[in-house]
């Protein structure tokens, strides 16, 4: 058996992509080795290919050297699903970052797109504006700057009620078969040739004609079922969750267990819409609103985002810089800002200085005036539960009539119709909240042990959606942040733990409570290295990756080659 030579592998990789795109030292690999919220480990190298052919060649080199490959696009995941975790791998680990492969190809007059591995949702949204269409997800990813393929591979949900999880049955990907051989699978529905070199080069250069694009009515480029599923408000199961076997297909839900080169996706017609802001001190009000709007409008609501007052307050203070940055510079620049902050943090940590940038940003924003509209602030003070609702204009009159009549009878809440600025800021505030718990932790290290972040899908008929924790658990928590995609009954629940409490123990206690409620988790952030993959999901991973060469160990599965079983 040939002896493994790290230097020989690195030299081969450098010959493929160039020396500057093979990173090996701890500081330059830091932003690729660490998750945004969770996960970290050692790597042999981070490789950043510049073409699809280079991506294929890097993959060949990695498999030839018997390395584990972790595919990574934007690294905005929240469960460590695109970074290494721990140091107990049985083979060297390579991270392949696809951030340079940003190609987006518009086909069928904008009704569909083909996205390469590094394409971002923000860029796709900008391109589709010229066609008066939208991607599956608009600004609404927990970490702005998320990639299109990351969403598909982790069947991410998002805020848009009608669209469900990111999903396609049309993809171009590579997998390692049970004999350990690398294969390229072209299920993109585009005739591109026969050899990997020809297929990948022609795709990247868009060297195909309209006649080469195949339209098979049996193959979907989006989830056609969800708009029906979400309206079934009396069903005793969640509308969507990561381990749903009916939404796992090749690249969709693959979580890096294959190497994806491109996906083909439907786009969506842009519609004129209006935003309502709803506040209440009775959770039953929001339940009644959800059930009515999902079943009685001319068209499904576009979005319905829930914010608990405690999450509102933490987000207002500790998500302020994110909010203001996006307001000033737009979403396209957020990844650059994160990368710059990460480099500064990495440099300072060499001198044992941790969290300085967070403290500085908090100090700056503390002295800036309030960034949220006056009417939202008034509702913050009056109401515990908040719902930001967007409906198509053909449903606006009926929605307003219902809310007016409802709150005439139920004095526990109220609503207002947002101006364009209020609506935009309300949704942006909701998304800034998602990172606020991290900022709170990083600026209160002496008080905070860590964060337990849960991503849950409740049953569609569950009326008891406000969590009641046992007193024994409550006393270990400094703050609870509840927010989420209310009409989908998907909630994000961040618990900021007091110093001295074990986050893992607390998380496992939370899981037992969720099991008792027959909730599914994770709902849309995928298992990463945080959650346990349920049998259907673990079996899907093993089928895709029989040698266990890709993204090893996710979902608490085996980190061993061939899944720890004898080679068949």
Feature map (PLM): residue ranges:
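Short, conserved secondary-structure transition motifs
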Residues: 146-153, 305-321, 423-430, 526-539
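Conserved glycine-rich FAD pyrophosphate-binding loop
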Residues: 36-38, 42-44, 72-74, 79-91, ...
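N-terminal flexible segment immediately upstream of the FAD-binding catalytic core
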Residues: 1-63, 77-113, 311-320, 373-376, ...
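A conserved active-site cap/scaffold subdomain adjacent to cofactor or substrate pockets
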Residues: 269-303, 310, 317-363, 372-409
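General beta-strand structural signal in soluble alpha/beta enzymes
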Residues: 22-26, 48-49, 69-73, 80, ...
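FAD-binding subdomain of flavoenzyme oxidoreductases
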Residues: 129-287
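Anion-binding (especially nucleotide phosphate/pyrophosphate-binding) glycine-rich loop
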Residues: 88-93, 98-101, 108-148
């Amino acid at each position: 058996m040939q002896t493994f030579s790290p230097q020989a592998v690195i030299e081969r990789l450098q010959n493929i992509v160039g020396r500057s795109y093979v990173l090996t030292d701890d500081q330059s690999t830091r932003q690729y080795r660490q998750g945004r919220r969770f996960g970290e480990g050692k790597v042999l190298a981070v490789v950043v290919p510049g073409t699809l052919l280079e991506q294929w060649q890097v993959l060949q080199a990695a498999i030839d050297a018997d390395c584990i490959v972790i595919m990574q696009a934007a690294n905005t995941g929240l469960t460590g699903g695109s970074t290494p975790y721990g140091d107990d791998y049985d083979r060297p680990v390579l991270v392949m970052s696809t951030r340079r492969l940003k190609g987006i190809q518009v086909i069928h007059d904008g009704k569909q797109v083909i996205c390469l591995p590094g394409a971002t949702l923000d860029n796709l949204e900008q391109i589709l504006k010229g066609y008066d269409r939208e991607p599956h997800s608009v600004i609404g990813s927990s970490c702005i700057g998320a990639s299109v393929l990351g969403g598909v591979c982790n069947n991410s949900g998002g805020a848009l009620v009608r669209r469900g999880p990111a999903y396609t049955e049309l993809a171009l990907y590579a997998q390692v078969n049970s004999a350990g051989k690398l294969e390229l699978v072209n299920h993109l529905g585009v005739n591109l040739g026969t050899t990997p070199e020809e297929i990948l080069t022609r795709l990247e250069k868009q060297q195909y004609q309209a006649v080469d694009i195949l339209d098979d009515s049996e193959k979907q480029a989006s989830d056609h079922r969800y708009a029906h599923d979400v309206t079934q408000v009396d069903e005793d199961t969640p509308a969507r969750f990561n381990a749903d076997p009916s939404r796992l297909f090749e690249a969709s839900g693959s979580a890096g267990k294959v190497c994806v080169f491109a996906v083909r996706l439907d786009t969506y017609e842009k519609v004129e819409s209006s935003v309502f802001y709803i506040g209440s001190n009775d959770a039953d009000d929001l339940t009644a609103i959800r059930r009515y709007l999902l079943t009685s409008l001319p068209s499904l609501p576009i979005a319905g985002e829930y914010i608990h007052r405690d999450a509102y307050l933490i987000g207002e203070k500790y998500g302020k810089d994110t909010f203001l940055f996006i307001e000033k510079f737009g979403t396209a620049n957020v990844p650059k800002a994160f990368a710059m902050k990460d480099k500064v943090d990495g440099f300072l940590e060499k001198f044992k200085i941790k969290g300085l940038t967070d403290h500085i940003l908090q100090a700056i924003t503390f002295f800036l005036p309030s960034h949220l509209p006056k009417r939202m602030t008034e509702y913050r003070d009056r109401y515990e539960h908040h719902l930001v609702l967007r409906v198509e204009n053909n449903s606006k009159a009926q929605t307003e009539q219902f809310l007016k009549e409802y709150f005439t009878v139920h004095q526990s809440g109220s609503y207002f119709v947002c101006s364009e600025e209020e609506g935009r800021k309300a949704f942006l505030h909701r998304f800034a909240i998602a990172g606020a718990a991290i900022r709170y932790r990083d600026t209160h290290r002496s008080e905070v042990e860590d964060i337990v972040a849960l991503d849950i899908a409740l049953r569609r008929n569950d009326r008891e959606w406000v969590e009641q924790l046992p007193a024994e658990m409550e006393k270990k928590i400094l703050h609870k942040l509840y927010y989420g995609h209310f009409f989908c009954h998907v909630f994000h629940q961040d618990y900021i733990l007091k110093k001295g409490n074990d986050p893992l123990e607390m998380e496992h206690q939370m899981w037992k409570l969720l099991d008792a409620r027959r909730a599914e988790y994770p709902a849309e952030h995928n298992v990463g290295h945080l959650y346990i993959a349920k049998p259907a999901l673990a079996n899907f991973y093993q089928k895709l990756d029989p040698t266990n060469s890709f993204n090893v160990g996710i979902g608490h599965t085996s980190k061993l080659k061939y899944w720890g079983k004898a080679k068949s």
